[in-house]
């Protein structure tokens, strides 16, 4: 088991090293719910393992930017951080992430609902961030869940384990995007090139979320 964990972590680290983060993306923080005023739409996102910043470096900031373009002046973007550190080892825990990350995500949904009762919440997660969303959203109160209009999950590490859905949450509000050949969607933690391809799916994901507003 220790050897398997070491090999998996080594593979993940090698892929991260081969996929450098752009400086402009790294500087995006996405702390607008906590630090800003209420907006018509609040986008809450959990980044993938090893990604930096509040929104991460790939699909998180890209989805935020597309939403802001399609709903000018109406969208606040909030990443699940800093308590959620997006470490590699937490992928191997029973829920695919750790309880600290889950609690932080839950608290952000609850903050959006209490601070901005009229905002429409949309959400997303990538890789381990998708696992964060599965666990957090499934345990929210029905009142807060009702305020969530749509969720998009990229490269969902809990896709197979949870039957292609977020437990206790409407399937028509959920879009799980799994690229052909992405083995994490099949219940493994084997990282292939397909797991790094989701930037191409951002427009479709944003269309889904906008369509739910």
From Swiss-Prot:
- Swiss-Prot/TrEMBL catalytic activity: cutin + H2O = cutin monomers
Pfam families in alphabetical order: Cutinase (PF01083)
* Localization per Swiss-Prot or TrEMBL: Secreted
What drives induction of this protein's expression?
Induced during growth on cutin, in a manner dependent on transcription factors FarA and FarB. Induced during growth on suberin. Induced during growth on the lipidic carbon sources 16-hydroxyhexadecanoic acid and propyl ricinoleate (synthetic cutin monomers), triacetin and triesterate (triglycerides), and olive oil. Repressed during growth on glucose.
| Active site feature | 127 (nucleophile), 182, 195 (proton donor/acceptor)
Please give the SUPFAM superfamilies that the UniProt record associates with this protein.
alpha/beta-Hydrolases
What GO terms fall under cellular component here?
Answer: extracellular region
Site annotation Transition state stabilizer: residues: 49, 128
Cite the GO molecular-function annotations of the record: cutinase activity
Q: What class of enzyme is it?
A: hydrolase
What superkingdom heads the lineage?
Eukaryota
| UniProt keyword annotations, A-Z | Disulfide bond, Hydrolase, Secreted, Serine esterase, Signal
Role description: Catalyzes the hydrolysis of complex carboxylic polyesters found in the cell wall of plants. Degrades cutin, a macromolecule that forms the structure of the plant cuticle. Also degrades suberin, a specialized macromolecule found in the cell wall of various plant tissues.
Q: Which family does it belong to?
A: Belongs to the cutinase family.
* Protein name according to UniProt: Cutinase 1
* Species per Swiss-Prot/TrEMBL record: Emericella nidulans (strain FGSC A4 / ATCC 38163 / CBS 112.46 / NRRL 194 / M139)
């Amino acid at each position: 088991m220790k050897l398997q964990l070491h090999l998996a972590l080594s593979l993940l680290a090698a892929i991260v090293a081969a996929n450098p983060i752009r400086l402009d993306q790294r500087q995006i923080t996405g702390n607008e719910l906590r630090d800003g005023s209420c907006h018509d739409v609040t986008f809450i996102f959990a980044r993938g393992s090893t990604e930096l910043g509040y929104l991460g470096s790939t699909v998180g900031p890209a989805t935020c930017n597309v939403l802001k373009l399609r709903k000018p002046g109406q969208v606040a973007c909030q990443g699940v951080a800093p308590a959620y550190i997006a470490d590699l080892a937490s992928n191997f825990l029973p829920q695919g992430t750790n309880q600290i990350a889950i609690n932080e995500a839950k608290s952000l949904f609850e903050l959006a609902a209490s601070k901005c009762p009229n905002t429409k919440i949309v959400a997303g997660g990538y890789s381990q961030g998708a696992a964060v969303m599965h666990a957090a959203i499934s345990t929210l109160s029905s009142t807060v869940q009702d305020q969530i209009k749509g969720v998009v999950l990229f490269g969902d590490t809990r896709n197979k384990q949870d039957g292609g859905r977020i437990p206790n949450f409407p399937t028509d509000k959920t879009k799980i995007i799994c690229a052909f050949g992405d083995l994490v969607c099949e219940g493994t933690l084997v990282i292939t090139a397909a797991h790094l391809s989701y930037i191409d799916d951002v427009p479709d994901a944003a269309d889904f979320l906008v369509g739910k507003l």
